[in-house]
Amino acid sequence: MTSGSHNDPMLVTILAGLAALILVSALLWSANYVSYRWIKERTLRERPWDYNICCGETDGGGINADIVRHGEIPRFELVTDVTRLPHGDGAFAHVLCSHTLEHVDDPKAMFAELRRVGRSVTILVPPLWDLAAALNPFEHRVIFLTFATRHDDRLPPYVVFGPARWIQSVRGQRIIAHSPGARLMKALGLR
């Protein structure tokens, strides 16, 4: 037996652990890409959205609104309170709210306001199969109890994400309006 043969099982264990880490990371990134990018882009292509609330960096075709301007978005509207939008009842035929309700303290109040200004409201939320998003304690304040990303004219059930609220009370809430790769890297503290 050579002196290096004792290290072979350890090397195999290390390599297997590294391979598992790479596989899990790839699966988390893929789920996050499908949840945040692919489904959102498919939804955006369906029609021009009269009101794209909390638009981030996307153009929905109508008014694009957010609490902060993330880039050069056409027809941008700055909103200061997502529970008191500056529009009349039923002002928009089609409202899109993508990956926002999980960030707010009171999703019911925001959804009620979306229903007030929109005749048809589509929301996209992180589904439970997207673990990196659904369980993101740095950004999200609630966990939606759903395996679907898209919900038309209804708010899926959710629970308050208590540990996240504690973390955010200490570190602040981070909201990243970029690609899912950047979002995942920042959430993991790698950027």
Where are these regions (language model features)?
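Compositionally biased, low-hydrophobicity segments enriched in charged and small polar residues
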Residues: 38, 95-97, 163-168
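S-adenosyl-L-methionine-dependent methyltransferase catalytic module, highlighting the catalytic core
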Residues: 108-191
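Conserved SAM-binding loop
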Residues: 46-130
